[in-house]
Amino acid sequence: MNKVSYALGLSIGQNFRASGFDEINLDDFLAGVRDVLEGAEPQMTYDEAKVVINDYFQEVRRKAVEQNKEAGEEFLKINGHKTGVVTLPSGLQYEVIKMGDGPKPELADTVECHYHGTLINGQVFDSSMDRGQTAKFPLQGVIKGWTEILQLMPVGSKWKVTIPSDLAYGDRGAGEMIQPGSTLIFIIELIAIVGK
């Protein structure tokens, strides 16, 4: 066994699996590699290959968005029936953990919060609470679900908020953890209104 060749195969295979290439015909894949390495005439042009790959990735993404949205809708449906959960007309859901007695922020305000964000499977994607560092941001500079819910929260409140994908990052997702079409869950603690 040539270790370098095998290691390259492992690396490429791992990348393919991580990228969602689950429909690869190994014989055709190896034929493409062989044609390039042996200088043979390819069975399609490089431009055609780019189009095929791009179309495939778009379809993989479309399916992922659809699956994530369906899972999120099912989660919201079940969550909405839990005691203490309020569903707003926008689809945003919240549950009061602690109700504060301070003022409510307005759209032009900047707020200081603690938050803990998870996917519906419980995987943490971001947490100021875990970092031990509050976050400050303008209400107009966050996802729609945050903008909406923070204007309902009195300072001093701590709420569990479930945000449908269209009020979160929508079909674009965010980073590696938040896939397109993801419903998000946050524990949000509104600490202060820090300015306009």
Predicted regions and their residues:
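Cross-family detector of peptidyl-prolyl cis-trans isomerase
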Residues: 1-196
